[in-house]
Amino acid sequence: CLGNHDTFPIDQLAPPSIFSRFLMKYLNETWKLDKNALKTLAYGGYYTQLIQPKWRIVAINSLYYDNHNKLIKETIDIANQFKWLNDTLLEAKKNNEVVYFIGHIAPKMGEATDYFTKNFKEIMKEYNDTIKYQFWGHEHKDRFFVYQDAHNNTYSFGFVGGSLVSDHKYPNFRVYKYDPKTKDILDFYHYRVNLTETIKTNKISIDQSYNASHTYG
């Protein structure tokens, strides 16, 4: 999915226009998506695609909800993304599909706008039985979070998987282990690029920093 470092200047992306279409055209040529996914990607930077029968990826363009983006108005549904999201999840629910949700700037984190946080949380509540997991970036930190209602009932769960950017830490990434039948996440393994060893040996040195089942139990 599209991140805030994918544009220049950073964080800036206009609503559908000749400038945004230029970027989306490049992504169209780079990402291997189906025809319908490429169509919505070209228009608004968001898409959905089946990975296999009954297992769907839904990806949003969170740059439209970045409060550092000076080219957008916060209180409107830019590129009809929320309408598309609701329609997509409704169809997935009717078809009994499992949805993995991906985005860059998570609601109520980083630079997410209040408009995004409010509307997204309502959608998560509505489709909590369809969206199995959320996967986010942007924070440059390894973390996870839960969404709870006023009665402390959990209605959604999300992962933030670190960053390859070496800002005050080693570049890091994550590999997930999942059940192919249920699509449950069974474990994940977090890796880092050891820059100290890489510089010493002039070879990329990757080691496992931890795995979830051993660390969290």
What kind of region is each of these model predictions?
Residues 1-15:
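Core catalytic region of metal-dependent phosphoesterases/phosphodiesterases
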Residues 3, 60, 85, 101, ...:
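Divalent metal-coordination and catalytic microenvironments
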Residues 8, 16-91, 95, 141-217:
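Metal-dependent phosphoesterase/phosphodiesterase active-site architecture
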Residues 64-83, 90-136:
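Active-site-proximal segments of metal-dependent phosphoesterases and phosphodiesterases across multiple
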Residues 12-26, 112-125:
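Short, electropositive alpha-helical surface patch
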Residues 1-3, 100-104, 127-145, 158-162:
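Active-site neighborhood of phospho(di)ester-bond hydrolases with catalytic His/Asp-centered motifs
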